């Protein structure tokens, strides 16, 4: 049995157009916002005179509400809207790097550069501050580190809520901010400062 070729799905029309509209009369909403109730046959003729389609947009109204528009353009707008929605709903990867409350400056700078890079690429990030042994008594140092991370990453992202303790770990989440990232990239391109290389990354699950 031959496999059927996959076909791209076009936006479904959820309303009637032109001759499909068979009610006696309709309410027309004109581009300037004015309205007029008229016989459907007259509305269809007017649509033809305007070189547009008569499109029913509120079938449950009494009488049904219609407008004059180009069906092809309307379908294109619907397709673009669906495309934009899918982009917004696109899932991002959660990246994670670990710190310790006594992380030195070199290690802090190195790891935050990686977190910054992750955010610039549109990923959410999680900084996990691990308290080994009795270091859990120094929770204030962990919170101070979380504040330093927040300040450092504020150029490309925003912190999600407050840092959260779970056992001997402190979790700090950040999400990318497109406006900040765009501004950051413009400054980078003008100054010519090379971006920090990204060597390895770790994926984490929500």
Swiss-Prot record:
PANTHER family: TRANSLATION INITIATION FACTOR IF-3, TRANSLATION INITIATION FACTOR IF-3, MITOCHONDRIAL. GO terms for biological process: ribosome disassembly. This is Translation initiation factor IF-3. It holds the Pfam family IF3_C. IF-3 binds to the 30S ribosomal subunit and shifts the equilibrium between 70S ribosomes and their 50S and 30S subunits in favor of the free subunits, thus enhancing the availability of 30S subunits on which protein synthesis initiation begins. Belongs to the IF-3 family. Its main location: cytoplasm. Keywords: Cytoplasm, Initiation factor, Protein biosynthesis. Monomer. HAMAP family: IF_3. One of its GO terms (cellular component) is cytoplasm. InterPro entries: T_IF-3_C_sf (IPR036788), T_IF-3_N_sf (IPR036787), Translation_initiation_fac_3 (IPR001288), Translation_initiation_fac_3_C (IPR019815), Translation_initiation_fac_3_N (IPR019814). It is found in: Cytoplasm. It comes from the Bacteria. It comes from Chlorobium luteolum (strain DSM 273 / BCRC 81028 / 2530) (Pelodictyon luteolum). Coiled coil: none annotated. The lineage of its organism: Bacteria, Pseudomonadati, Chlorobiota, Chlorobiia, Chlorobiales. Disulfide bonds: none annotated. Transmembrane segments: none annotated. GO terms for molecular function: ribosome binding; translation initiation factor activity.
């Amino acid at each position: 049995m031959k496999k059927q070729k996959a076909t791209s799905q076009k936006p479904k029309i959820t309303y009637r157009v032109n001759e499909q509209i068979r009610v006696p009369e309709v309410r027309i909403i004109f581009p300037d916002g004015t309205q007029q109730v008229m016989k459907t046959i007259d509305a269809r003729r007017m649509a033809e005179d305007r070189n547009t389609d008569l499109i029913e947009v509120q079938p449950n109204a009494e009488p049904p509400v219609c407008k004059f528009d180009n069906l092809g353009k309307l379908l294109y707008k619907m397709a673009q809207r669906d495309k934009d929605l899918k982009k917004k709903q696109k899932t991002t990867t959660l990246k994670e790097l670990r710190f310790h409350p006594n992380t030195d400056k070199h290690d802090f700078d190195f790891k935050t550069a990686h977190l910054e890079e992750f955010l610039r690429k549109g990923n959410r990030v999680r900084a996990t501050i691990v308290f080994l042994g009795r270091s859990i008594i120094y929770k204030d140092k962990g919170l101070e580190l979380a504040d330093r991370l927040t300040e450092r990453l504020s150029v490309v992202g925003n912190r999600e809520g407050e840092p959260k303790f779970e056992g001997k770990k402190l979790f700090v989440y950040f999400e990318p901010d497109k406006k900040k990232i765009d501004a950051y990239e413009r400054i980078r391109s003008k100054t010519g400062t090379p971006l920090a290389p990204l060597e390895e990354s770790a994926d984490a699950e929500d």
